[in-house]
Amino acid sequence: AFLKLSGAAAALLALAACGGGSSAPAAPSAPTGKEAELVAAINKIWKKKFDAGLVDHEQLTLNQEAQGAIKIQGGIFEDAKEPVHTLTTEDMKKLVGIQEWQISLEKKYDLGGAAGISEPSAEFEVSLTFEYSCEDAVVQKFVDKIMAYSLSREAEFISVYCPVVQGKTYMIATVFWNKTA
C-alpha cells in the first residue's frame, strides 16, 4: 500500500535500516484546508463507487494516523525540491520510517491502496504523479489508483498529504480500515 520497492531498493533500504535507531511515530497533524477539500472531492467519487456496489463504505473518514508515512514520502520530494527524483542513500534512510509507521498501523488497521507517488524505476527514480486538483476527472483517476489494490474496497479511513514542490501542490493518499470491525 505504501511505496513499494524493487529488490535492489529493498536491499538499500535494509542497509540503511542497520544504521539508525528506532523512534516512535510522531502524532499526526491536523489537516490543511487543501487536504480537507481533497477528502471531500474523493468522497464524492467514493459515494458513486458505493452506490455501484464497488466499495463497502459510503464515505471515507479522514484519519491522519497514516499521514506520517506518506509525509515521509512527500518530504523526500519537498527536500529535493523536484517532483521527479532519484532516490539517494539518505532518502532510503528516511524511508525506513515508513516501515515503523506500517508496523504501528498494522496493529490496529489493515492497509489498502495508495496514490500519488510512482513505483521506483530500475534507476530508483520516483515521481509525484498527481498535481493537486479537486476536479472530478482528476480525482476519479486518483481514486482509481487507490482502488488498484483490490482490498481498498474495504477502506473506511483515508490519510492525505499535499506536498508543495517548485510552487505546485501535489496529492498523496492511502486508505485503511479497522481490523476488528
Task: Give residue spans per PLM region.
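Short, well-ordered surface patches within globular domains
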Residues: 26-103, 156
